[in-house]
């Protein structure tokens, strides 16, 4: 019996019309349409990034200190979860805890920041199948909603 699951690799969907093309400059392989890269994290139920993503649209937001997000930022990010297609936010940070209702993961080795070319304020819209739908250097709720509409075929 052959375990073909070990031989499979995620598809790269870089030519999909559901992706939002980059408007900002990024290095690395985490382009729209790329499958997410895994990395070690702490602060959640699993020590691996990928275990915290999937089965829903999610926004990964990067911060140096998650506790330093402003009340306005938290309110805007939390509002994304109230839309017709909810987007749940997870803050990945070097330290700190984001205010509720946002989830926080700590980038213990800096691997998430390196693999995703993250700077404070960078954010990634991630699809339920753990592929990158869009990414920006700074959070903009209107751009996130437009990328969600495109990713769901409603643009």
Segment roles from a protein language model:
Residues 1-155:
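Helical substrate-recognition/capping region of FAD-dependent monooxygenase/halogenase enzymes
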